[in-house]
């Protein structure tokens, strides 16, 4: 009797889960996911978005490298995606009912020496997430290697304000903007020194790094950040006038 009851419960749970997948799939998109970086995700540090140490920058191990179709030449850096293993296709590999929200922090390059369905997982036009190993193991089993997934863009939740790290040299301020909440994906950045009343549009250099070619030494710095959804926030005088290249400053502003 106990075995029959347990079987019925399992069948009900499975039915409910598959109904859930079917009901949400219309609003979600299909892709595949693999993993990299090791069990502690140490191999995911750095990357094509320029965030550096993902542990200290607030992203931890819930990250992924995106294929060409999703990376959008770096414009997708900082964006967040909810990912669910598609148990309707590989129930033996999925962890039922589990999903995870990851941040795009890296680029998964194509491998044209291999077929798109046999090793060249990140070849265009395939949408693909190469997830940090701990993130992948939240939704699927290690032995799966690769699984079909459902994904959708979601808002990013961050602790604290946006962070501005200033690199470069005189007349070339290269500013990494990290820990961005809300839509996450930056579309435009402005900078203003305390000796000016005019906001200067910065150009994106690579990943989440934006540059200015103005001499700004000895000035406190303010930034305006616009996301891909059009929302704008200003971090006024977030950088003090005695700043030095290589320093990072955390604002009290976020989306």
UniProtKB/Swiss-Prot annotation:
Major location, coarse class?
secreted
Q: Name one Pfam family in it.
A: Expansin_C
- The source's domain of life comes to Eukaryota
SUPFAM superfamilies according to UniProt: Barwin-like endoglucanases (SSF50685), PHL pollen allergen (SSF49590)
Role description: Causes loosening and extension of plant cell walls by disrupting non-covalent bonding between cellulose microfibrils and matrix glucans. No enzymatic activity has been found. Target of the transcriptional activator LBD18. Regulated by LBD18 to promote lateral root formation.
Q: Read off the PANTHER family from this record.
A: EXPANSIN-A15
User: Per its record, how is this protein called by name?
Assistant: Putative expansin-A17
Q: Which organism is it from?
A: Arabidopsis thaliana
Which gene name belongs to this protein?
EXPA17
